[in-house]
Amino acid sequence: LSFEVIRNDLNQSYSVTPIEVCDYPLILTGDSAVNAFADGNSIYMTQGMMDFATADDELALVIAHELAHNAMRHIDAKRTNAMGGLVIDILIGVLTGVDTQGMFTQNFAQAHSQEFESEADYVGLYMCEISGYDITDAAYFWRRMGVKHPGSIEQNHAATHPSSPERFVSIED
């Protein structure tokens, strides 16, 4: 596999022989949004995130965070939570005729989301540290993400991620 990385106006060419060491493939999408996510089977990173990261340590941090979601089975837990909500949606529909429009399914799926994100931050940092990546500026990476996505700065009951200040302080500790 050969590829080229452009960082700080420098072109670097790499050639690697892939070996399977992890059961979660990393898939790069062409999307310009600054985002990465895990689905329980794979890790997805957008071109926007690749462009946003200023160092390999930051990319490792993002990948490790998403890997932690998969390794800690957060996606499976969300699916299980959603099933509980689905049962309630169905019962209300059958017993009252009211269409909840999946409200309970959606709300139950988001149960513990902020805790899952905090755990993925912690486990991801640990993975980076034991892998030899520099995590000194990890909190500042998340601060930059907060500036890029101002909606993540404030906390509210519907948020799926901790607020940016909460995340920054948690990682700094």
Which stretches of residues belong to each language-model region?
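A Zn2+-metalloprotease active-site environment signal
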Residues: 1-173
